[in-house]
Amino acid sequence: MLGTLYVVLSSSNEEDYQKVKKELLEVYPDFSVSPYKESQMEKDAVEFFATCQITKEKAKEVLDQLNNDWDGEVDDCIAYGFNTKMFDSLVYHLNFQLYD
């Protein structure tokens, strides 16, 4: 299955993006991470995508490491950093989707 993870960071700093990207790849090295761009969701923030081939079971394991309280099912879920514990404090928003 194809997994896509949309990430919004509450920073527009290149070093912060690189730090979070490194942490994300430590959680799941098979992610292919896109370059970042200015976020349309949040001021002074950046967004990027990470994609991978992943099983539903492995996706659940990875999601549990990225955030402690997802809204939705494993194949379509979101999390916000203001009311949950993210894998990095700079992560403002995550959206994960699985496709057959």
Regions found by a protein language model. Give the residues of each.
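Short, extreme N-terminal segment that most often corresponds to the first beta-strand
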Residues: M1-L25
